Amino acid sequence: ADGRSTRYWDCCKPSCGWAKKAPVNQPVFSCNANFQRITDFDAKSGCEPGGVAYSCADQTPWAVNDDFALGFAATSIAGSNEAGWCCACYELTFTSGPVAGKKMVVQSTSTGGDLGSNHFDLNIPGGGVGIFDGCTPQFGGLPGQRYGGISSRNECDRFPDALKPGCYWRFDWFKNADNPSFSFRQVQCPAELVARTGCRRNDDGNFPAVQIP
């Protein structure tokens, strides 16, 4: 199938971090304001008043080599719903912009309330907070536009240390691509992604495995 991408990092608890969203072994990990994992899956999101649960800093993208990356996204898949995509993994092959031909495997950790069909909102710190801003209550906020985020690599230097690598990734591996299109297919989740979210779908074995370079 063909899809389109945007980018965001709102610091909020991932929507797949709540119990009973999907047939999975456990919900996606959330973290406290200091980016430490919390074990209470019922903890209120930091994007709500009095909330304590935020996105974990390791649920951000990284390069495996020049042509292959791993990461996470909020998704909205045509003909499916949150029960169908929470913690599912997808192999994206970019088809436009400076990343055309590169591949990325992402795990769905959230659902974009403002997303269209076959839309992947890639988790990229500094990509813009979008509708919700959990970054301001978490650590005082991030620079950049609400939609689209920052515009230059050196702005990443002002980020919390834990979020810098994912911010730099956008300007390095991702070549500051602006919402590139891609083709995608569902695949088995690589262990490298599950290690960061803790979440694997019960039906994960039904999908083709991906060779990580």
From Swiss-Prot:
It catalyses: Endohydrolysis of (1->4)-beta-D-glucosidic linkages in cellulose, lichenin and cereal beta-D-glucans. CDD domains: DPBB_GH45_endoglucanase. One of its GO terms (biological process) is cellulose catabolic process. InterPro entries: GH45_Enzymes, Glyco_hydro_45, RlpA-like_sf. It is an enzyme of class 3 (hydrolase). Its EC number is 3.2.1.4. The keyword Hydrolase applies. The active site is at residues 10, 121. GO terms for molecular function: cellulase activity. The keyword Hydrolase applies. Gene3D superfamilies: RlpA-like domain. It holds the Pfam family Glyco_hydro_45. Keywords: Carbohydrate metabolism, Cellulose degradation, Glycosidase, Hydrolase, Polysaccharide degradation. Belongs to the glycosyl hydrolase 45 (cellulase K) family. This is Endoglucanase-5.
